[in-house]
Amino acid sequence: PVNISISNMGSGVAAIDFTGSKTASTFQVIRVFLDSSQTEELGTFSSQPILLQNLTTDEPYFLKIKATNEYGNSDFTEVLGVVTSANTPKVLIVNGFDRVSGTDNSFDYIRQHGVAIHNAGYIFDSANNESIINQRVKLNDYSIVDWILGEEGSATSTFTVEEQKLVQNFLKNDG
């Protein structure tokens, strides 16, 4: 799965949206807990977007997805997160830390960012930077954007001109 985002859909419901899995027959969703290697399988789904229901309201959920077909499994996606609530999220956390070589990228920094934002009294949605670039998620739907870049290097695209323009537009529109 690519272009991944997780959005609050109301009390106890979250939507996981993505593209790039046309040959997948099912999608396994795993919850990852903060400060623990413990995980919980939330289910296996056959359609998208995936709607997770009966989640605990006002509790951060950190999730990763794996696609499956008759030939095997994809790798798990990066970890993204959401807090479900009756209120509309004002904060979007964007994971732009894609680097895989020459770094210790655990692909789950959203857990630390999400908990800090939630402890400050905010609920949040999240997305990877590709879903922003490809206009699947709009920065201007939020008041606050936390864009995680990590230890990107010059051999990789750090914060592309396209990403910078999207953030500039967000700031010009009172973000």
Which residues does each PLM region occupy?
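Short S/T/G- and acidic-enriched coil/turn segments that sit immediately N-terminal to beta-strands
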Residues: F45-L51
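Extracellular low-complexity, O-glycosylation-prone stalks/linkers
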Residues: K22-E41
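Short, glycine/serine-rich, charged loops/turns that create anion-binding
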Residues: K22, G96-R99, E152
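Beta-strand-rich modules
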Residues: L52-Y71
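Helical hinge/lid and interdomain linker segments adjacent to catalytic or ligand-binding clefts
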Residues: S101-G175
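Tryptophan-centered short beta-strand motifs
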Residues: S37-F45, N73-F76
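Pro/Thr/Ser/Gly-rich low-complexity, intrinsically disordered linker/stalk tracts
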Residues: P1-A24, T57, Y71-T88
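Short beta-strand segments enriched in small/hydrophobic residues
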Residues: P89-G102
